[in-house]
Structures are given as structure tokens and as C-alpha cells.
Amino acid sequence: MNKKGIKISIIGSGFVGSTTAYALMMEGLASEIVIVDINKEKAKGEAMDLSHGVSFVKPVDIIAGDYEDTKDSDIVIITAGAGPKPGETRLDLINKNYEIFKGIVPEVVKYSPKSILLVVSNPVDILTYVTYKLSGFPQERVIGSGTVLDTSRFRYLLGEHFKIDVRNVHTYILGEHGDSEIAAWSLTNIAGISVEDYCKDICKGCEGNFKNRIPEEVKNAAYEVLERKGYTSYAIALAVRRIVEAIIRDEDSILTVSTLLRGEYGINDIYMGIPSVIGETGIKRVLEVKLSKDEEKQLKESAEVLKENLNKIPIK
């Protein structure tokens, strides 16, 4: 974005929203951060706590406010809504968060009609679709956090397994941010070497079942964190920061954000995590990467899961 000051508003000051504000502040990505929450005192407390540390980072104004204070935001990040409790899946939250979004999105659009909307609340793929419909924005300006975090978890676990720097592990998790997501093994490599060849020629210590075990660990990662600490915050905040960074710096980075499919992969009219080129206008391109036949089948099945659940709410 070719402008001096970047204004980012965060709707929701819970664990994810407040940690996201901290991550953005630490990276120096905004000149102004506005935090909005139904619990105004909580939002004020978060803004105060963050503001007390601004002497240690690049100059930034951090305030708690109402929707009118978000006016002319460049990016609006929506983290508000009910989070999953232990034993719940993300899809269990559909109806509760749909009702919450009906109150949020029109207010955001009213004050920032040219903004890019970044949805983080769960179930993120469905709520991104809801935001797209409620906002009337073009699809490239309505983005979900998608499987950006899942992909990071996958890379981390593969790096741990192969005892290699995670930055040299290249792969994607695609589809729903949830239980029907798929691991794109056909695209997975370590410094250009397929995991099969790496295992056979270099690692030579694999127990053989990692291709089943690791994707399950990725799927269950959030649930395990929930069981232990009651919520997730740090990793998702860093994932959101990465998406925002790609937008603000017009990086043309490829990230597995939740994007609207219009026939790609034989899938129509659903948001899901797909490799997409991200820059200052939002989603610049949706990439159709070559998947195995089985992965294509699983991706379509993931889309069907999302469509079945989307049909539970009266969105038009």
C-alpha cells in the first residue's frame, strides 16, 4: 500500500484479537490500530496495556473505540465471536457466530467501504463467505485466515520429524480450516527433495507411518492446545500478521488463505484454504496447483462438508 499511514481495525479484543494487535504492533505494520469490542472496558484495557509499550516499537497510535472510530481503515480484522470449548469443533459455532457477524459486518462496511476484510473467527471459511455476502465487497477484498496456520503447523511437525529447519520444508494444508482439511503430500518437499526420497536417502530413520500420523496431529493441534490452556492465540496471531504484512507490503506472496472458488478444482461458490497470491488489493490470483487424484477428491469432499454446513444458515 503506497501511503504513509496504515490504519488497521480489529473487531474483538479476546485472546486472538489482543494478541493480533500485539503482533502487528511489534512488526510495525500500522500507524494506527483501533480495537473494538462489545466489552468496552476490556478493549480499553488492552489498548492501554499495548500503548504503555509503544516507546519500544515504531510509532503507533492504539485506541479502543466504537465502529465510527474505525472510519477509513485500510484493513479490518474480525476476530469477534464465540470460540470452541473443549470437545467442540469449529463447525459447532456456526449459528452463534453468524448472528454476531450480522451485527458486525454492516457497521464495518458503513465506515470503511474501501477496506480489505480479514476474517479470523471460526468457522473461518463459512464466516468469510458470510462476510462476503453481507458486505457486498468484491471477493478479492474479503479474505479468511484459511489454512495459513494449519500449513505452518504442518511444516513445523515435518521439520521436527525430519530434524530440519522448518523454513526448508515446503508444503500446504488445503480445504477447510478444520477436520476435513487435507495435507498436500504431492506438493511436499524438503529443499526440492520429495519426502519419500528424503526419508529413503537421507533420513533413514522414519517409522513409516508419519504420512498418516502428522496430518492427524495438525488437525488435532488446536484441540490439544484448547485442552491445555483453554484457547489459542500466539500462532494464529502470527498467521494473521503474516497475511497483513503481505497485503501492506504488496508482496505477491502465496498463502493458503480462505478464498472464494469460482470453478477452480471443480469447486464453486465456497470459501476454503487455497494457495493464493496476496498483495495490496487483497487476493490477486487463486492458484490451481497440480494435486494427486486422491487429493483432488479429498478437496471436493472438504468443499461438500463446508457447503452442507453453510446450508444451515439463511445466508443469501
UniProtKB/Swiss-Prot annotation:
Single GO MF descriptor: L-lactate dehydrogenase activity
CDD domains reported for this sequence: LDH_2
Any one of the GO CC terms: cytoplasm
EC numbers, comma separated: 1.1.1.27
Family the UniProt entry places it in: Belongs to the LDH/MDH superfamily. LDH family.
Modification Phosphotyrosine, positions: Y223
Domain of life: Bacteria
NCBIfam families in the cross-refs: L-LDH-NAD (TIGR01771), PRK00066.1 (NF000824), PRK06223.1 (NF004863)
Free-text activity regulation comment from the record: Allosterically activated by fructose 1,6-bisphosphate (FBP).
The entry's keywords: Allosteric enzyme, Cytoplasm, NAD, Oxidoreductase, Phosphoprotein
Reaction(s) catalysed by this chain's protein: (S)-lactate + NAD(+) = pyruvate + NADH + H(+)
Active site: H177
Organism: Clostridium tetani (strain Massachusetts / E88)
Residues spanning the membrane: none
Description of how the protein assembles with itself and partners: Homotetramer.
Compartmental location: Cytoplasm
Organism lineage string: Bacteria, Bacillati, Bacillota, Clostridia, Eubacteriales
Function statement: Catalyzes the conversion of lactate to pyruvate.
GO biological process, one term: glycolytic process
Protein name as it appears in the record: L-lactate dehydrogenase
PANTHER family assigned to the protein according to its UniProt record, in alphabetical order: L-2-HYDROXYCARBOXYLATE DEHYDROGENASE (NAD(P)(+)), L-LACTATE DEHYDROGENASE
Residue positions binding NAD(+): V16, D37, K42, Y67, G81, A82, V120, S121, N122, S145
